[in-house]
């Protein structure tokens, strides 16, 4: 009702006829923001750690698990985040004879290990009109989330001859989603948008650092360290047939997958000498470092999914000769010394 009254007032001020004859008959209308927002989106965070020390060993082990549902799309599994982390930090004193001799008198070994696994989904961000949130902010409350009864049949009849039209039904209740008219431009029914499957992002990251420090002589130390970073990440998903608006439709189903991997390792050897004479301190450092970064990626798409319950590339029928199958990939390598 408030929207209809404001639109009528705007029309009168512009010198044109009011659009709504009985604005008080429309009631509350659709609160699109209320429909879109995931109220009380849950956040869960668990942390556990164990630590201890002795004359020979210092150690810390920890694990964490974190999940968060998105405020927009979280209840549609379109905006969610999950992270698992594991960490281990240990230091070993293999021997310490510094009180008995001044050569080869101590050796310490350190290891730091960590692992992180992340799974996430996300919706389009930073879009004024095309995103679910942008549409929820600007759509008319006179529109309904669903077309039911005669309105549903009217939609099917209206778009029957539109070549890329595929109706979208809510998987939760089987109702037909409404389609905003052309006067709303790029805006779409945000609930229909959120009901579509989004890309599922994933990553695995392993980080390991090892070092050993040997006391060679008084004031003379040798330290060697090795670090490795292994990362694997990508996304998988599919696009079904759908029609949200003119210019916002998919006339063919597509399965896609993208995978990346990267490895970075670094080796350092350092010889250190420190000497203090009266009020003067001298330091000499001799070092060597080597680093290598390698990686690769592989991406593929294939159209014509046979069954949405198995939306995978190997369960689709598209052929490369018809332009319905693509693949790409490449390695990479950078090394320094």
Enumerate the language-model features and the residues they cover.
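Generic recognition of flexible, low-complexity loop/linker segments
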Residues: 36-37, 46-49, 210-211, 273, ...
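An active-site-proximal structural segment forming one wall of the substrate-binding cleft
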Residues: 220
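Predominantly transmembrane beta-strands of Gram-negative outer membrane beta-barrel pores used
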Residues: 45-76, 85-91, 110, 209, ...
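Short strand-turn segments of transmembrane beta-barrel domains in outer membranes
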Residues: 1, 18-49, 62-75
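Surface-exposed loop/interface segments of Gram-negative outer-membrane beta-barrel transport/assembly proteins
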Residues: 1-28, 73-81, 85, 91-205, ...
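A generic structural signal for short, solvent-exposed coil/turn residues
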Residues: 42, 53, 101-103, 214, ...
